[in-house]
């Protein structure tokens, strides 16, 4: 996120922080969400959690934006970091700036997530608890994640080999 955190245009502005890859992957969504907002780009993979959090906290302290919206790709661990950084920056600055967590889901539809959803994603034992209570989430995951489908294929192949060796 390359900007001076005290830039006059940030003072009490509506700020959109958007994953860098979105402009090329979803240009119409970029245009739609950038309307009437100061738009900053970030590549969480390149910038890292600590750097992003520090930059966001400093921006909040120095410029006091009216609101912050984060728009990223759903399913990207790097993009998840941008949402977590926004929550951490609010915590560190002890401010309650309205924050929207937005993700571009499959087929390009945008979904708003609560700050609590972002926080929950950091606690894997709680995510596991959610899966145990709602196992059909794994079916949903299968429709979204190539990694999951590949792991399931390998697991099935191992089970078949194991069954053949016992026969």
What is each stretch, according to the model?
Residues 1-167:
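Iron-sulfur-associated redox domains of electron-transfer enzymes in respiratory
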